[in-house]
């Protein structure tokens, strides 16, 4: 139910009558932005005299409107306000009937969606950048589910490639020590340390070999400089992680780690049983830790999709390369044994820029290595085909803007293979990076802030905030406040804008934070806890201006949900909830609820209940935990 539906229809009917009186063949649309009233419409393009428009409006002044008031003409604008009493009745009726589903309308039902998010490499803990991905994807799924769409959430496990093999080789070199560490630390954290150390050892070995072959002194000096950088990385890792990293260096220092990784990856992709056993042991350890982190945020995954199973062992990625070579030999080139598809020429020739919503520049794409093994983009095409076959109307892939070209290549290759509908079905839900002031992250160098660290610090800082308010319950609720603050921080900004993560903003108790919203909810809850059951309240003819504003804001909730789900923008919900909370807190300071006279008291209790109902629905969509004390 949408409380604004009847008022909007009544205004539209009035516009129809005005247009008829003026002899116009069409009715102007209602403006999205307000002009001189809640509803406005422009008559500018009809080139009529403003006096005629004013006269036509005045003829309707006694039309007995139920839901709008103050119909007027200002220049060539026709405007109307809302009848606050009738709007209040519509709001209370909708809230009573819909309960926690208030905000849902049939227009929100868009079909079925496969949402893929997070999909982090299984070699280290989720870091702060993965946090934005995971929280965005989870809130998209929640928003779609709130609107009764069928949704399934997937995580793509990228278990192939040299980086996973580095983690596997390192882990098996210090397996006994690693298992001891895992008894007292998260497995993804332990494997992450091992991976960073193994990668550094591999890079040092590779660079040393290259330096030995270098003929040019300047090039040799450059390589030695790079070696020194990686030695510094190892030194820093040993200072922070001690014995475990030292053991990795001791046992791998004289081995050709890079060569071993290539060979292990070849065996794994070929389906060698022993390679599968050792690699999957490490991958599953990391996924166990990543699952724990996601669970902390209230995020659930419906299905874990392994790259090896869906793209490599199935032979799908290889078939894609063969089919492109067969269909489009004129767009295929060979460079040093690698297969390259001229996606740039293909797009130009078939004019696909707008059809596939492509970026302005498209480079050629390499499909295989020189040894014939397929690369990431080819496997991603195989995965996209598998996703499309699962029977969903849309496939939403939450992937950073850094992969804009890779995701464009996926759509182009699908189109080239004859899967035009699949290419159009896939949505690359792009998002920008999270910046931590003063820090540049690199997982390969073991330099990143894990999502667990962010959540730990959020809980710790929240505990100190909460102690000032309720010292006896600080420890119990600090985690929920921390989770709410982090989730809101990642959702309140447009996905296409970078986030600068600052604690003074994330935990702001006065506005625009998850903490502020939770604090507002506790205020509403505490009022209703002391009040008798919410009864069907009558709406007074006269009310405070803040009460009118609150009723209008609550009435707008269904349209906010509708716009958010159509645009796939949870930040619309975050922005709306912040505005609602600001209005409610201002009202809370001015208007007594429980001590008001009987008729007014019932109305205000119903108003507070409506605010609480909307906050609960919004909290579900954003994944913010509800609190009853703070």
Curated annotation (Swiss-Prot):
Alphabetical list of Pfam families matching this protein: DALR_1 (PF05746), tRNA-synt_1d (PF00750)
Origin superkingdom: Archaea
Keywords assigned by UniProt, alphabetized: Aminoacyl-tRNA synthetase, ATP-binding, Cytoplasm, Ligase, Nucleotide-binding, Protein biosynthesis
Enzyme class: ligase
Reactions it catalyzes: tRNA(Arg) + L-arginine + ATP = L-arginyl-tRNA(Arg) + AMP + diphosphate
Location of this chain's protein in the cell: Cytoplasm
Entry's Gene Ontology BP terms: arginyl-tRNA aminoacylation
Paired cysteines (S-S): none
Residue numbers covered by motif 'HIGH' region: 120-130
Cellular component per GO, a single term: cytoplasm
Gene Ontology MF term list: arginine-tRNA ligase activity; ATP binding
Protein's recorded name: Arginine--tRNA ligase
């Amino acid at each position: 139910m949408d409380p604004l539906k009847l008022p909007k229809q009544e205004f539209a009917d009035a516009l129809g009558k005005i247009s008829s009186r003026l002899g116009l063949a069409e009715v102007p649309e209602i403006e999205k932005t307000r002009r001189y009233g809640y509803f406005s419409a422009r008559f500018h393009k009809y080139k009529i005299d403003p006096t005629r428009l004013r006269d036509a409006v005045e003829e309707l002044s006694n039309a007995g409107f139920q839901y709008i008031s103050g119909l007027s003409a200002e220049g060539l604008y026709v405007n109307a306000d809302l009848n606050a009493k009738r709007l209040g009745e519509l709001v209370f009726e909708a809230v009573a009937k819909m309960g926690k589903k208030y905000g849902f309308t049939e227009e929100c039902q868009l079909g079925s969606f496969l949402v893929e998010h997070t999909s982090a490499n299984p070699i280290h803990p989720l870091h702060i950048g993965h946090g934005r991905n995971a929280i965005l994807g989870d809130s998209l799924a929640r928003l779609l589910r709130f609107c009764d769409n069928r949704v399934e959430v997937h995580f793509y496990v990228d278990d192939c490639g040299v980086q996973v093999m580095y983690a596997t080789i390192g882990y098996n070199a210090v397996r006994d020590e690693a298992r001891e560490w895992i008894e007292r630390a998260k497995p993804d954290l332990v494997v992450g340390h091992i991976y960073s150390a193994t990668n550094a050892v591999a890079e040092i070995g590779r660079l040393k070999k290259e330096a030995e072959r270098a003929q040019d002194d300047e090039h040799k000096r450059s390589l030695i400089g790079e070696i020194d950088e990686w030695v510094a990385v190892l030194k820093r890792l040993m200072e922070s992680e001690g014995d475990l990293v030292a053991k990795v260096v001791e046992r791998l220092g004289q081995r050709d780690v890079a060569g071993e990784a290539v060979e292990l990856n070849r065996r794994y992709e070929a389906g060698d049983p022993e390679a599968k056993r050792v690699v999957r042991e490490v991958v599953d350890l990391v996924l166990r830790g990543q699952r724990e982190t996601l669970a902390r945020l209230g995020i659930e995954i419906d299905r874990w999709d392994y790259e090896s199973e869906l793209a490599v062992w199935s032979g799908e990625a290889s078939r894609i390369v063969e089919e492109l070579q067969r269909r489009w030999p004129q767009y295929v080139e060979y460079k040093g044994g690698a297969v390259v598809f001229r996606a740039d020429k293909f797009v130009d020739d078939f004019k696909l820029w707008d059809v596939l919503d492509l970026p302005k520049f498209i480079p050629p794409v390499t499909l295989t290595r020189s040894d014939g093994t397929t690369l990431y983009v080819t496997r991603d095409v195989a995965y996209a085909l598998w996703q499309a076959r699962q029977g969903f109307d849309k496939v939403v892939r939450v992937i950073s803007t850094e992969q804009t070209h890779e995701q464009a290549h996926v759509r182009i290759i699908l189109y080239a293979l004859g899967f035009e509908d699949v290419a159009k079905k896939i949505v690359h839900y792009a998002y920008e990076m999270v910046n931590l002031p003063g820090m540049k992250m690199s997982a390969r160098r073991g330099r990143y802030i894990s999502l667990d660290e962010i959540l730990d610090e959020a809980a710790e800082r929240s505990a100190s905030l909460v102690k000032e308010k309720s010292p006896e319950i600080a420890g119990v609720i600090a985690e929920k406040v921390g989770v709410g603050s982090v989730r809101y921080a990642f959702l309140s900004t447009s996905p296409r804008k970078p986030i600068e993560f600052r604690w003074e903003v994330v935990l702001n108790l006065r506005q625009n934070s998850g903490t502020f919203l939770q604090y507002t909810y506790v205020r509403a809850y505490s009022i209703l806890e002391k009040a008798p059951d919410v009864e069907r309240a009558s709406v007074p003819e006269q009310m405070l201006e803040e009460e009118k504003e609150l009723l209008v804001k609550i009435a707008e909730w269904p349209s906010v949900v509708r716009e958010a789900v159509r645009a796939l923008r949870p930040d619309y919900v975050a922005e709306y909830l912040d505005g609602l909370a600001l209005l409610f807190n201002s009202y809370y300071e001015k208007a007594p609820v429980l001590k008001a006279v009987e008729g007014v008291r019932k109305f205000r209790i119903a108003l507070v209940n409506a605010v609480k109902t909307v906050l609960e629905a919004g909290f579900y969509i954003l994944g913010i935990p509800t609190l009853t004390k703070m």
